[in-house]
């Protein structure tokens, strides 16, 4: 079932999300510290007539890692090639991409933490020395051939930086953490998106959507489209505070951007374990959700807004969450 506040990209929204992506740093809203550092790196590289150092972008999904890779490519006037860790199953898969690169190309590998070790080892000499070692043949007759690669930049993206091996992580010259966006930045993203989509919206309407967007541009753009649909049918076509509130309430997204699944996680810990602590494996079984999905997709936002704590003994619901859900906290 579609989860409207999922940070993950849905297949049916890929094209429209592309249309909303900024093309330059001037259009890119938020991540100011990161933008300044990257802008300096790019200008310095251009001044020296060199490629930018390899870049690692990490942070929760939906914050614009792919978008930023596109912006960097545009600023460098470079071609961008996109792939992902799970797709590159064999060393030959990555070798084929590397040998197709042209000078100054940018290779973007999403979910780079999911590369298997055999594929990952191909990257080491490619990143460090601009060389690709290929084994031709098998057994005693096998030969190693070294191919010189043109200068290129690798941009790796991950939601789990801690899962990267040290040898791979150390080969990135630049490493940046993508931060959640504040409400004002999200509001600006919504107003920009509305303009591109031809949607009428006032500032109060944009603020109401931004408060429920979980600090994530991908979610903000998705909610904007849903509220637009609601206003076209049940409103006057213009998104204001009341129409945005009514639409999002109907969609089950509350004032903190929480949905039924978030509420189920918190309520399950409260009702079954008096608020915790409860181990992640137990919680996974209780909710019928994969452990990795809980850790990577569901928990980060609950932790960010102070509703859930990760402790050595397990997950614990906070007093702030009890107040939000109007539950009576059990003191032990």
Swiss-Prot record:
Residues that bind DNA: 291, 310, 315
Region (Small ATPAse domain (RuvB-S)): 182-252
GO molecular function: ATP binding; ATP hydrolysis activity; four-way junction DNA binding; four-way junction helicase activity
Assigned keywords, A-Z: ATP-binding, Cytoplasm, DNA damage, DNA recombination, DNA repair, DNA-binding, Hydrolase, Nucleotide-binding
Main subcellular localisation: cytoplasm
Chain spans, region Large ATPase domain (RuvB-L): 1-181
Pfam families documented for this protein: AAA_lid_4, RuvB_C, RuvB_N
GO cellular component labels: cytoplasm; Holliday junction resolvase complex
Catalytic activity: ATP + H2O = ADP + phosphate + H(+)
EC class (word): hydrolase
SUPFAM superfamilies the UniProt entry points to: P-loop containing nucleoside triphosphate hydrolases, Winged helix' DNA-binding domain
Domain observations: Has 3 domains, the large (RuvB-L) and small ATPase (RuvB-S) domains and the C-terminal head (RuvB-H) domain. The head domain binds DNA, while the ATPase domains jointly bind ATP, ADP or are empty depending on the state of the subunit in the translocation cycle. During a single DNA translocation step the structure of each domain remains the same, but their relative positions change.
Subunit description: Homohexamer. Forms an RuvA(8)-RuvB(12)-Holliday junction (HJ) complex. HJ DNA is sandwiched between 2 RuvA tetramers; dsDNA enters through RuvA and exits via RuvB. An RuvB hexamer assembles on each DNA strand where it exits the tetramer. Each RuvB hexamer is contacted by two RuvA subunits (via domain III) on 2 adjacent RuvB subunits; this complex drives branch migration. In the full resolvosome a probable DNA-RuvA(4)-RuvB(12)-RuvC(2) complex forms which resolves the HJ.
Cited function: The RuvA-RuvB-RuvC complex processes Holliday junction (HJ) DNA during genetic recombination and DNA repair, while the RuvA-RuvB complex plays an important role in the rescue of blocked DNA replication forks via replication fork reversal (RFR). RuvA specifically binds to HJ cruciform DNA, conferring on it an open structure. The RuvB hexamer acts as an ATP-dependent pump, pulling dsDNA into and through the RuvAB complex. RuvB forms 2 homohexamers on either side of HJ DNA bound by 1 or 2 RuvA tetramers; 4 subunits per hexamer contact DNA at a time.
Protein name as it appears in the record: Holliday junction branch migration complex subunit RuvB
Organism name: Fusobacterium nucleatum subsp. nucleatum (strain ATCC 25586 / DSM 15643 / BCRC 10681 / CIP 101130 / JCM 8532 / KCTC 2640 / LMG 13131 / VPI 4355)
């Amino acid at each position: 079932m579609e989860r409207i506040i999922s940070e993950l990209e849905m297949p049916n929204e890929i094209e429209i999300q592309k249309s909303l992506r900024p093309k330059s740093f001037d259009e890119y809203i938020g991540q100011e510290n990161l933008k300044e550092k990257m802008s300096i790196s790019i200008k310095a590289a251009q001044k020296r007539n060199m490629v930018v150092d390899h870049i690692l972008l990490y942070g929760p999904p939906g914050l614009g890692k792919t978008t930023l890779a596109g912006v960097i490519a545009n600023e460098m006037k470079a071609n961008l090639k996109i792939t992902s860790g799970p797709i590159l199953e064999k060393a030959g898969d990555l070798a084929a991409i590397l040998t197709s690169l042209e000078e100054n190309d940018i290779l973007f590998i999403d979910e780079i933490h999911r590369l298997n070790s055999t594929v990952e080892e191909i990257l080491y000499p490619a990143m460090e020395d601009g060389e690709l070692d290929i084994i031709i043949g098998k057994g005693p007759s096998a030969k190693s051939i070294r191919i010189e690669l043109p200068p290129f930049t690798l941009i790796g993206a991950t939601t789990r930086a801690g899962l990267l091996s040290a040898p791979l992580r150390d080969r990135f010259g630049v490493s940046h953490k993508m931060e959640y966006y504040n409400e004002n930045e999200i509001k600006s993203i919504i107003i920009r998106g509305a303009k591109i989509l031809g949607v009428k919206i006032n500032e109060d309407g944009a603020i109401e959507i931004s408060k429920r967007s979980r600090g994530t541009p991908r979610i903000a753009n998705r909610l904007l489209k849903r509220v637009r649909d609601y206003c076209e049918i049940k409103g006057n076509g213009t998104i204001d505070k009341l129409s945005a509130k009514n639409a999002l309430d109907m969609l089950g997204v509350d004032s903190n951007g929480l949905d039924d699944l978030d509420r189920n996680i918190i309520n399950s810990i409260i009702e079954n374990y008096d608020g915790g602590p409860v181990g992640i494996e137990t919680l996974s079984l209780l909710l019928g959700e994969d452990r990795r999905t809980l850790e990577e997709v569901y928990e980060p936002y609950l932790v960010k807004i102070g509703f859930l704590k990760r402790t050595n003994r397990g997950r614990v619901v906070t007093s702030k969450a009890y107040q939000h859900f109007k539950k009576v906290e059990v003191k032990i």
